[in-house]
């Protein structure tokens, strides 16, 4: 059977379910597909089907993630659900599944639990733009308790920098919805309505300022130097001015040619593998790890705060803990740069399998923004992953 072509008639949004273990994330994911399938907007996916999530590798780390897709009247959604708590942490820190928004699932019978808190904090740290709350299991919870849970949740969200008073909290039962109960189904439609209206539509990569990480460099005699790589965001046209950022001092140039698969183009855009011919740039002035970007849109930095996950021994990580002044390589986009790690006050050492916030100082500057992902490596072997949460210098 021929594959159905992907129709771009609705805006596309990536979302996911987050929250404490056994609060009903996977049941809710199954319920959403079940309820929307009745409107012809989804293929119903059974709980067991989603729960057996396939393993994927992202930045050298194995993560189990289930992907489902569905539509509403307004949008097309790609939805991720992770079976295990560690998978969520790895997913959010590596950006394996970039989330434009998330549904925080909280059981009305329990209220916020430790992982609820941890997932909200992580969502804040890795810049998930918006959350919507689904208060689950309300059919078996005490109504007075539900009011308290809602208040507690709003306070918790505010504490972590989300607009706790404004976030939609939808009450329902994912299990009832999955069983076809009309009240249960109504809550799911209400939830999707909140997701449609409250989670903002993401800016598409092509509409962001131009940036291309340099993967390879070669010179064309008599014409100049070419940097090749995959355009990460934005568009580039011939004769546009660019900046070369990272490792060495930032310098300006002009793109005098754009090539893709040996063909000349007038314009390159996000997702293209392209070669850019740069005016007046010597081959020695361009190297892997630099980025070519729209002037003034990104700066090189050496010091930053990051949220990191350190691999367990079983995941191919370190066998021993590390301490302040640990000096691994940080792999950003296309290259490794050595850096020193400073642990937060009160943390003596970091064990394989931990996730925490650290300060890093690199020996050479790298073009970075908050939210940039990286791998932590020792001699080419991945031992962790991280996300830049704040630039210090």
UniProtKB/Swiss-Prot annotation:
Record region (G4): 136-139
TM region positions: none
Stored CDD domains: EF_Tu, EFTU_II, EFTU_III
Binding site for Mg(2+): 26
Residue numbers binding GTP: 19-26, 81-85, 136-139
Entry-linked HAMAP family: EF_Tu_B (MF_00118_B)
Known function: GTP hydrolase that promotes the GTP-dependent binding of aminoacyl-tRNA to the A-site of ribosomes during protein biosynthesis.
Name of the featured protein: Elongation factor Tu
Protein's gene: tuf
């Amino acid at each position: 059977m021929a594959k159905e072509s992907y129709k771009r008639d609705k805006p596309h949004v990536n979302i996911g379910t987050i929250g404490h273990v056994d609060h009903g994330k996977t049941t809710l994911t199954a319920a959403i597909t079940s309820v929307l399938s009745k409107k012809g907007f989804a293929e119903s996916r059974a709980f067991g089907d989603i729960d057996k999530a396939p393993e994927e590798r992202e930045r050298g780390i194995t993560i189990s993630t289930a992907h489902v897709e569905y539509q509403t009247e307004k949008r097309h959604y790609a939805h991720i659900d992770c079976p295990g708590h560690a998978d969520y942490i790895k997913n959010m820190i590596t950006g394996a599944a970039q989330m434009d928004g998330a549904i925080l699932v909280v059981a009305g019978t329990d209220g916020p639990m430790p992982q609820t808190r941890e997932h909200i904090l992580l969502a804040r740290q890795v810049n998930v733009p918006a959350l919507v709350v689904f208060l689950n299991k309300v059919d078996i919870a005490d109504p007075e308790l539900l009011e308290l849970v809602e208040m507690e949740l709003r306070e918790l969200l505010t504490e972590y920098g989300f607009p706790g008073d404004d976030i939609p909290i939808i009450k329902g039962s994912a299990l009832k919805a999955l069983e076809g109960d009309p009240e249960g189904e109504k809550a799911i439609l209400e939830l999707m309505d909140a997701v449609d209206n409250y989670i903002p539509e993401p800016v598409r990569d092509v509409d962001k300022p131009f940036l291309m990480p340099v993967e390879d460099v070669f010179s064309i005699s008599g014409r100049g130097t070419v940097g090749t790589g995959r355009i990460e965001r934005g568009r580039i046209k011939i004769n546009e001015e660019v900046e070369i950022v990272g490792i060495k001092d930032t310098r300006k140039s002009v793109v005098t040619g754009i090539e893709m698969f040996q063909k000349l183009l007038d314009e390159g855009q996000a997702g293209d593998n392209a070669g850019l011919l740069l005016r007046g740039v010597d081959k020695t002035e361009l190297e892997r790890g630099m980025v070519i970007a729209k002037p003034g849109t990104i700066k090189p930095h050496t010091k930053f705060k990051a949220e990191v996950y350190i691999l367990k021994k079983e995941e191919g990580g370190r066998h021993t803990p590390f301490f302040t002044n640990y000096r691994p390589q940080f792999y950003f986009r296309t290259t490794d740069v050595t850096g020193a790690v400073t642990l937060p006050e009160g943390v003596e050492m970091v064990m394989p399998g931990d996730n925490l916030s650290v300060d890093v100082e690199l020996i050479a500057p790298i073009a970075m923004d908050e939210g940039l992902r990286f791998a932590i490596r020792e001699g080419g072997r991945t031992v962790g992953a991280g996300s830049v949460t704040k630039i210090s210098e």
